[in-house]
Amino acid sequence: MAGLGKPYTGHPGDAFEGLVQRIRLIVPSTLRGGDGEAGPYSPSSLPSRCAFQFHGHDGSDESFPIEYVLRLMNDWAEVPCNPYLRIQNTGVSVLFQGFFHRPHNAPGGAITPERTNVILGSTETTGLSLGDLDTIKGRLGLDARPMMASMWISCFVRMPRVQLAFRFMGPEDAGRTRRILCRAAEQAITRRRRTRRSREAYGAEAGLGVAGTGFRARGDGFGPLPLLTQGPSRPWHQALRGLKHLRIGPPALVLAAGLVLGAAIWWVVGAGARL
């Protein structure tokens, strides 16, 4: 079972100490913490022995977040591992010990979907790995998504016996948790679609910019001239438009046409005077 931790570039000892401190923050403060195996460990160099340990005194009633702790260890590691928690009745207290791998001759298989309660006599030991926990959760058909069912250990220390109850506990409001997960998924999909639309719009604008450059290169960058008026055109406006489109011929033809037009005007004026 491979871990999902991120590379750590600082001092290896600081990385491992940070993991232990995070575990201490989520474990009940009534459990006394102890030191595990000393050494310069990192996500790629895991301890081969006990990584952390906690003690519960006689008469205490504790709840240990076993699944959260094991998954925290698995996510921190960068190499394959199968975190394991061992619980022992020492005769005077209960001892919780965490390992990145199941120790040799460590008990296993005591916790099953049918058997979730264990009574430890003096010096007796039990334990559970993350792989076995996932198997139990799958056989029970529980929701494996984050923030849903998570295993806890209810520990009752009454010497010379220690009673353990392994229970899956979910959120106080499962419907609200599902809505939060659905809303988070919808927001992620919306962000993905918005990013896709932005990229498509940017590509379309870039294409229009290239086409516009070619249009200006042909000398038509200013486009068609706007109309001078929005209302009906007047006669003299139409005459001006006609003059704009009038084509002038050769100079000799223009001179001959002028002479003919002048003679016609002179003849009309003379004829009118005689009448």
Swiss-Prot record:
Signal peptide: none
Ranges facing Nuclear side: 273-275
Keywords: Host membrane, Host nucleus, Late protein, Membrane, Phosphoprotein, Transmembrane, Transmembrane helix
Modification note: Phosphorylated by viral kinase US3.
TM helices/strands, residue ranges: 252-272
Coiled-coil ranges (or none): none
InterPro entries: Herpesvirus_viron_egress-type
Listed GO biological process terms: exit of virus from host cell nucleus by nuclear egress; viral budding from nuclear membrane
Domain of life: Viruses
Membrane-topology descriptor: Single-pass membrane protein
Subcellular location per the Swiss-Prot or TrEMBL entry: Host nucleus inner membrane
Gene Ontology CC terms: host cell nuclear inner membrane; membrane
Region (Interaction with NEC1): 137-181
Perinuclear space topological domain: 1-251
Major localisation: host cell
HAMAP family, alphabetized: HSV_NEC2 (MF_04024)
Family per similarity comment: Belongs to the herpesviridae NEC2 protein family.
Function (record text): Plays an essential role in virion nuclear egress, the first step of virion release from infected cell. Within the host nucleus, NEC1 interacts with the newly formed capsid through the vertexes and directs it to the inner nuclear membrane by associating with NEC2. Induces the budding of the capsid at the inner nuclear membrane as well as its envelopment into the perinuclear space.
Subunit structure, as described in the record: Forms a heterohexameric complex with NEC1. Interacts with glycoprotein D; this interaction recruits glycoprotein D and glycoprotein M to the inner nuclear membrane.
Listed name of the protein: Nuclear egress protein 2
The species this protein was found in: Human herpesvirus 1 (strain 17) (HHV-1)
Lineage: Viruses, Duplodnaviria, Heunggongvirae, Peploviricota, Herviviricetes
